[in-house]
Amino acid sequence: IAWALLLCGAALMFWLDMFDVQIMAQTLVNGADSFSLLAIPFFVLAGEIMNAGGLSKRIVDLPMKLVGHKPGGLGYVGVLAAMIMASLSGSAVADTAAVAALLVPMMRSANYPVNRAAGLIASGGIIAPIIPPSIPFIIFGVSSGLSISKLFMAGIAPGMMMGATLMLTW
């Protein structure tokens, strides 16, 4: 995608007779030169370290002890684990993969329908871009000039309400 955008922009500049290699290089460097954008690779690194260290299993163990004993408790565990993972890593895909790898086999062995279990875990993964720290919040804040801390504060209540709604409808 990045190469396609770069080539389209270069073709447009060439067609409009505005092609200057120095301006293009300077724009590329200035676009990526942001202190706030450094948070994104560090979130990914933190997620990899947590996954390698076995923190994902421990994160699932906490909701398991809190609500796992209730009827339908594995569903509640899935949503709570997704919310906890979202508050740590900021990546929806990584959170969903970690929670699904641990909980879908457990839900299958507890005779939950596989499509319903996978749907719940996938729906829980959608909470990750809302609950801070969120990679999409950082990208949106940097590109629009909004305060990232205010975006983070604005995401707490909706993320909690989404999680509560998922647990109520399970």
Role assignments for model-derived ranges:
Residues 1-170:
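Alpha-helical transmembrane segments of multi-pass membrane transport proteins
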